[in-house]
Amino acid sequence: MAAAVRFRVVRALPMSRPAITAAATSVFCGSSHRQLHHAVIPHGKGGRSSVSGVVATVFGATGFLGRYVVNHLGRMGSQVIIPYRCDVYDIMHLRLMGDLGQLTFLEWDARDKDSIRKAVQHSNVVINLIGREWETRNFDFEDVFVNIPRAIAQASKEAGVERFIHVSHLNASMKSSSKSLRSKAVGEKEVRSVFPEAIIIRPSDIFGREDRFLNHFANYRWFLAVPLVSLGFKTVKQPVYVADVSKGIVNATKDPDAVGKTFAFTGPNRYLLFHLVKYIFGMTHRTFIPYPLPLFVYSWIGKLFGLSPFEPWTTKDKVERIHISDVMPTDLPGLEDLGVQPTPLELKSIEVLRRHRTYRWLSSEIEETKPAKTVNY
């Protein structure tokens, strides 16, 4: 009798979605430098549970502007890699800003090029928001605004990143009296030399709930009077709302015409510093008592505050920076070119300044305060 033939059924294991995508890419496109990841293929109806096609690494995501950028990216269904140096408890608020598994947190060292490469190797967008208002023993302005951005841009270029967005400042200039603004101007030049297609964002002073602009002046209530160089009549400011800056940055990740351009983000109105601070105290229902202080005296006081081992109230550089008038960007595209309508200061300032009011004024309406006087120069 012939031997019985037995057939053995072998069950094939299902392939994961990344494996299918990688296999399809290798078949139809051949071997490539960077394999196509399923996260860069947009699908869904929009929102946090869809896929926007953006895989973004956001340096400086734990800062003031960073949380808004991460929130906008997560809201439209992007994967976000968040390098951090702080304690894990300081990034907990970011975990809720994206769908399950869409946010990846990665410890990094700003001076370790390998950790930078690891943070950007899977991204098609890299956003640099790293900034600091004062120098420390570990990082001075040259490190923060020149060396680190150059290293990130270099790693992004080597990794084949499609879009690199670098945030600077509207008044960045090699001739500025502020060391931080001079360093930011050098940083722009270094980034552009390493990554010519980089998108550079130059916002004016940014205001929002956690800012160091409106809150800084409002906190002068503890000193009973506000020192201003020339009483603030020689300084013009054009502050911009933080959510507008965030939307502009996110829109720049998708705009094909934004590549290689420099954008100036400003608010719709310009104010003399005197009228702006007067409006801040009017919103908080506090008595506004300004007094003139020479710049060299104010800078010397800021230098003394800067010697504090803790977060300084002010510094010599900040005194100089807040008394520099915002330039009028006539030749640079702005928020409108990225589909964002700038928000007037008067509409959002109550969100920032309400906490500075005394208890009996907490429920008063915004209309009770006279708007700040604007200028056209």
Swiss-Prot record:
GO terms for biological process: aerobic respiration; circadian rhythm; proton motive force-driven mitochondrial ATP synthesis. It comes from the Eukaryota. Binds 1 FAD per subunit. It holds the Pfam family NmrA. Keywords: Acetylation, Electron transport, FAD, Flavoprotein, Mitochondrion, Respiratory chain, Transit peptide, Transport. Acetylated on lysine residues. BLOC1S1 is required for acetylation. Acetylated by CLOCK in a circadian manner. The modification N6-acetyllysine is found at residues 189, 370. One of its GO terms (molecular function) is NADH dehydrogenase activity. Coiled coil: none annotated. Its cofactor is FAD. Gene3D superfamilies: NAD(P)-binding Rossmann-like Domain. InterPro entries: ComplexI_NDUFA9_subunit, NAD(P)-bd_dom_sf, NmrA-like. It is found in: Mitochondrion matrix. One of its GO terms (cellular component) is respiratory chain complex I. Residues 1-35 form a transit peptide. The modification N6-succinyllysine is found at residue 175. Belongs to the complex I NDUFA9 subunit family. Complex I is composed of 45 different subunits. This a component of the hydrophobic protein fraction. Interacts with BLOC1S1. Interacts with SLC2A4. Interacts with CLOCK. Interacts with RAB5IF. Accessory subunit of the mitochondrial membrane respiratory chain NADH dehydrogenase (Complex I), that is believed not to be involved in catalysis. Complex I functions in the transfer of electrons from NADH to the respiratory chain. The immediate electron acceptor for the enzyme is believed to be ubiquinone. This is NADH dehydrogenase [ubiquinone] 1 alpha subcomplex subunit 9, mitochondrial. It comes from Mus musculus.
